[in-house]
C-alpha cells in the first residue's frame, strides 16, 4: 500500500519546521512477518521515528496485510505512548473495508476518539472555530482564513488540512 506514496501527498503545509508531509514511513512487512507477526517491526519503526524525528505524535495506519495478521496495534500504541510520552494514534483503515472516503472518515474518527478532548486550550477565543474536513489541498485555506480573521473569527484548529498536533 505504501510503495507509491512518496511525494504523492500534495497538501501544502505552513509548518516552518522539517516538512515530513511527503514521507511515508513503513514497517516493510515480509512473508515471515505475516506468518509470525509484525509487532516487533512496528515497535522498532515507532522507536526509529521517535529517535530520528522527535515528533509530537505518530499516526499508524493499519493496512490490509497488517489487519489480516491480527497484531494488537492498539496495545503497541498504548505502550509506545506511555514509554515516550507522545500520542500514538492507530487508524484502523485497511483498504478492504471500503473506499478512500471511508478511509478519510476512519482517520477523522481516530483523531476524535484518541486526541480530541485530551487537553483544553490555554485561551478561548470568543469567536473561535474548528474546521473539520478541511484538507487545504491547494492552499485554499490560506485564502479564506484572512477573510475570517478580518471579521473577527479565529481558526483555532483544522482537521485535517494544515493542522498541528499540540500536546
PLM ranges: what are they?
Residues 1-167:
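An N-terminal assembly and electron-transfer interface module characteristic of large anaerobic redox
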